[in-house]
Amino acid sequence: EPYLITLTTESDVFPIFQHDGSEFIYMLEGRVAYRHGRNVYDMKAGDSLFFDADVPHGPEKLKQLPISFLSVISYPTSRRKG
């Protein structure tokens, strides 16, 4: 499932997420400190991250707004609709 995420000064604080599957993030605009488990990645336009979504993850610090990134989630086969 693809999602286009945009964060601005009016965005709510992002919680930490955790869900089944794998996730791929591709930064389009801005800068963010993105947490995955105990690691924090400083990400800017052009950067990408692929990770196990079972591990807690999410934006930790919004460094340069607006922030825009593509998030593509691949859920386990049992969750996919036929």
Residue ranges and their predicted role:
Residues 16-17, 24, 40-41, 61:
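Short secondary-structure boundary/capping segments
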Residues 6, 17-34, 72:
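Short, conserved beta-strand element in jelly-roll/cupin
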Residues 44, 53-80:
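Ligand-binding loop in jelly-roll beta-barrel domains
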Residues 15, 35, 69, 79-82:
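Short acidic, gly/pro-rich beta-turn/loop elements at beta-sheet edges
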Residues 1-19, 39, 53-56:
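Conserved short histidine dyad/triad with adjacent acidic residue
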Residues 37-53:
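Short acidic-glycine-tyrosine-enriched beta hairpin
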